[in-house]
């Protein structure tokens, strides 16, 4: 199962029932535009701490832009905290589900 597949499962089973509609929509935006875009095709059992760390560092430095475009600012601390927390919640549940 890829991270993208698990994220879609997690959103439907856990997030949708535990979050307000606006929060659920915001999570969907962050997943779609940041997390799935870069990490989604990695199988859960192959996802490493280094890959997640590199992803977070890239987002912090370059935002949604390519590293070749340094003129664009990175994401703000508030957005980075949301991305980190959301990915952590999802992966923590994957561990509880016995998938990692």
Give the residues covered by each predicted segment.
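N-terminal core-binding DNA-recognition domain of tyrosine recombinases/integrases
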Residues: 8-21, 32-100
């Amino acid at each position: 199962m890829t991270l993208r597949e698990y994220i879609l499962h997690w959103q439907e089973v856990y997030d949708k029932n535990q979050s307000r509609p606006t929060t659920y929509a915001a999570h969907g935006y962050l997943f779609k535009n940041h997390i799935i875009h870069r990490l989604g095709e990695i199988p859960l059992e192959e996802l490493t701490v280094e890959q997640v760390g590199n992803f977070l560092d890239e987002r912090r430095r370059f935002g949604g832009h390519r590293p070749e475009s340094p003129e664009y600012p990175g994401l703000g601390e508030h957005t980075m905290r949301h991305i980190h927390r959301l990915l952590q919640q999802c992966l923590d549940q994957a561990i509880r589900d016995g998938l990692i």
